[in-house]
From Swiss-Prot:
Location(s), subcellular: Cell inner membrane
Catalytic activity: UDP-2-N,3-O-bis[(3R)-3-hydroxytetradecanoyl]-alpha-D-glucosamine + H2O = 2-N,3-O-bis[(3R)-3-hydroxytetradecanoyl]-alpha-D-glucosaminyl 1-phosphate + UMP + 2 H(+)
Lineage of the species this protein comes from: Bacteria, Pseudomonadati, Pseudomonadota, Gammaproteobacteria, Chromatiales
Biological process terms in GO annotation: lipid A biosynthetic process
Binding, Mn(2+) 1: D8, H10, D41, H197
Function text: Hydrolyzes the pyrophosphate bond of UDP-2,3-diacylglucosamine to yield 2,3-diacylglucosamine 1-phosphate (lipid X) and UMP by catalyzing the attack of water at the alpha-P atom. Involved in the biosynthesis of lipid A, a phosphorylated glycolipid that anchors the lipopolysaccharide to the outer membrane of the cell.
Keyword field contains Transmembrane helix: no
A GO molecular function held by the record: UDP-2,3-diacylglucosamine hydrolase activity
Binding site for substrate: N79, R80, D122, S160, Q167, H195
Recorded family membership: Belongs to the LpxH family.
CDD domains, per the entry: MPP_YbbF-LpxH
GO cellular component: cytoplasm; extrinsic component of plasma membrane
Gene that encodes the chain: lpxH
Protein's UniProt name: UDP-2,3-diacylglucosamine hydrolase
Entries under InterPro entries matching the protein: Calcineurin-like_PHP_ApaH (IPR004843), LpxH-like (IPR043461), Metallo-depent_PP-like (IPR029052), UDP-diacylglucosamine_Hdrlase (IPR010138)
């Protein structure tokens, strides 16, 4: 019995090593679990379910095989793949989750997010995020030819990379007040998210009660996967010095 969590693989053209790591994980490790949660940015960009890349099709096939052996799959979109939809869901076997989502993780209420909405200090990003997700903007974009959509996505990706390079690290990280507010609003003990590419386990208190925030890592330099059993967590990431820790109780 185990539940897996991954995020921020950013699969796409020219990322053969990451693609191979992902396929290996999905075919050799994940089948031993009961559930897999993908918390966004599985793909570097996703321009619509009608235009999957070769890399995307390979991952969809691997996910479907995992679903067919009985593993429950969940997908919560990130800032790079928020156009993943029902066609992807049906093909891969993934259930689409809203952001945020709350699950019962072996008796512990746990909040799942991609994590970008917690980076409230990056005002420019939050404004751009809200603008890009307007229904009218999405309808217009999805009506464009695939080649145009791909060009727009690549341009936005370049702009995002340039934005990140010119921002202080503190602005690009989550805001602690936003984290604590999310935990209060949803009445949960712990939070699991990705987005920042800073894998870590943070312990703190909210209103005098212990709380836990687990940050999933990117896959650029190796696998980053979190697993949880009734006995606790194991964080498979070379950047985590103490990979085993408890599922927060109380």
């Amino acid at each position: 019995m185990a539940t897996f969590f991954i995020s921020d693989l950013h699969l796409g053209t020219g990322k053969t090593e990451i693609q191979l790591r992902a396929i290996e994980f999905l075919s050799q490790e994940a089948p031993y679990g009961d559930a897999l949660y993908i918390l966004g940015d599985l793909f570097d960009y996703w321009i619509g379910d009608d235009a999957p890349t070769a890399e995307g099709l390979a991952i969809i096939t691997a996910l479907r095989r995992l679903a067919d052996v009985g593993v429950t799959l969940h997908f919560l979109s990130g800032n790079r793949d928020f156009l993943v939809g029902q066609v992807f869901s049906q093909a891969s076997g993934c259930q689409i989750l809203s952001d945020p989502a709350i699950i019962d993780l072996y008796g512990v209420p746990t909040l799942l997010m991609h994590g970008d909405t917690l980076c409230t200090d990056d005002v420019a990003y939050q404004r751009a995020r809200a603008r890009l997700r307007r229904p009218a903007i999405l309808r217009t974009y999805l009506a464009l030819p695939k080649s145009w959509r791909r060009a727009v996505a690549q341009r936005l990706r370049r702009q995002s990379q340039a934005h990140v390079q010119h921002q202080p690290l503190t602005i690009m990280d989550v805001n602690q007040t936003a984290v604590e507010t999310a935990l209060r609003i949803h009445g949960v003990k712990q939070l699991i998210h990705g987005h920042t590419h800073r894998p870590a386990v943070h312990h703190f208190t909210v209103d005098g009660h212990p709380r836990q925030r687990i940050v999933l890592g990117d896959w650029d330099r190796g696998k980053s996967a979190l697993s949880c059993t009734p006995e606790g967590f194991h964080f498979s990431d070379s950047r985590i010095l103490e990979p085993r820790f408890g599922n927060l109780q109380g």
